[in-house]
């Protein structure tokens, strides 16, 4: 009897020990997942230092800003953006940007910015105030970040929470296929979403993107986009169109048209969402007007 009792006690102690160990592992794992957030208050400004600057092309650069510690993440939900603000020539300038780095990355955040220099574009002789200011920053100098901001949040597995305006409650929209229309730097929120979807093995949402630019040299994040297209050919389809295509160009030419949308985006459906980001004339005339013509419901469209 004593041997049996001792054995039972040992078994009971072993079970308790394993249970406690599993609890501790789960608790520690849960804590490890919750990295400290940088953006705690969407109305507060957080000065972040420039820690690296990399030239991507003749007029495009990657700016890496340091977070408060190597353990911090930015804290930006997928679909949201940040505002950068700075006093430039005595005036406050504010611009919206979507990071290209994942929000799971610790210690830093990356922005890809096209720098609009003075006396290059006839319509904008002064160039871009914020982009030139960013380009002028020296390593260690700071700029104010504010966020998260935006009316759209991607939850998971095709679920979007979309607010009609800042005062409204979000409405849930579920999509099996996401159509995307991007122009120029409007590609950044699209890449953010594409990465989130394709990196989640449990997310079967499909994405189809039409990316419009003036020339082949203007295509931002081309390597990143084509890498995803090659590694997820059934889930992500990519199509370019250029105003001035080079000889032998195998993609589209000219503005985004109804025929182009019909060929490269999913057809209108209740389980289709179409996202747009680019210059206002493109959004209105090339995107919205053609989507209306093709019968895409307004409830399934969103322009960043």
Curated annotation (Swiss-Prot):
Domain annotation FAD-binding FR-type: ranges: 43-155
GO MF term set: cytochrome-b5 reductase activity, acting on NAD(P)H
Key words of the record: FAD, Flavoprotein, Lipid biosynthesis, Lipid metabolism, Membrane, NAD, Oxidoreductase, Steroid biosynthesis, Steroid metabolism, Sterol biosynthesis, Sterol metabolism, Transmembrane, Transmembrane helix
Positions of transmembrane segments: 9-29
Cofactor: FAD
The keyword Lipid biosynthesis is annotated on this UniProt entry: yes
Localization terms from the record: Membrane
Principal EC category: oxidoreductase
Keyword Manganese on entry: no
Protein's membrane topology: Single-pass membrane protein
InterPro entries associated with the record: CBR-like, Cbr1-like_FAD-bd_dom, FAD-bd_FR_type, Flavoprot_Pyr_Nucl_cyt_Rdtase, FNR_nucleotide-bd, OxRdtase_FAD/NAD-bd, Riboflavin_synthase-like_b-brl
GO cellular component entries: membrane
Predominant location: membrane
GO biological process: response to yeast; sterol biosynthetic process
EC number: 1.6.2.2
Protein name, per record: NADH-cytochrome b5 reductase 2
Species the sequence originates in: Xenopus tropicalis (Western clawed frog)
Organism lineage: Eukaryota, Metazoa, Chordata, Craniata, Vertebrata
């Amino acid at each position: 009897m004593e041997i049996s009792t001792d054995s039972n006690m040992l078994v009971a102690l072993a079970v308790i020990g394993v249970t406690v160990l599993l609890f501790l592992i789960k608790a520690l794992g849960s804590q490890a997942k919750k990295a400290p957030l940088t953006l705690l208050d969407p109305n507060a400004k957080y000065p972040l230092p420039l820690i690296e600057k990399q030239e991507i092309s003749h007029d495009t650069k990657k700016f890496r800003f340091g977070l408060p510690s190597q353990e911090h993440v930015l804290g930006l939900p997928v679909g949201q953006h940040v505002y950068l603000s700075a006093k430039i020539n005595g005036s406050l300038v504010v611009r919206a940007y979507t990071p290209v780095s994942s929000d799971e990355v610790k210690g830093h955040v990356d922005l890809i910015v096209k720098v609009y220099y003075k006396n290059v574009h006839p319509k904008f002789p002064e160039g871009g105030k914020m982009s030139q200011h960013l380009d002028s920053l020296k390593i260690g100098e700071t700029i104010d970040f504010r966020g998260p901001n935006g009316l759209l949040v991607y939850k998971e597995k095709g679920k979007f929470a979309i607010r009609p305006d800042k005062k409204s409650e979000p409405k849930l929209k579920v999509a099996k296929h996401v159509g995307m229309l991007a122009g120029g730097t409007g590609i950044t929120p699209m890449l953010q979403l594409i990465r989130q979807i394709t990196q989640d093995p449990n997310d079967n949402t499909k994405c189809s993107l039409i990316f419009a630019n003036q020339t082949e040299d203007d295509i931002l994040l081309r390597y990143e986009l084509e890498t995803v297209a090659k590694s997820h050919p059934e889930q992500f389809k990519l199509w370019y169109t250029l105003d001035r295509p080079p000889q032998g160009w195998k993609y589209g030419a000219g503005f985004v048209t109804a025929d182009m949308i019909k060929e490269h985006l999913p057809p209108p459906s209740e389980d289709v969402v179409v996202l747009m980001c680019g210059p206002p004339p493109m959004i209105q005339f090339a995107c919205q007007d053609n989507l209306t013509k093709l019968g895409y419901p307004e409830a399934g469209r969103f322009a960043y």
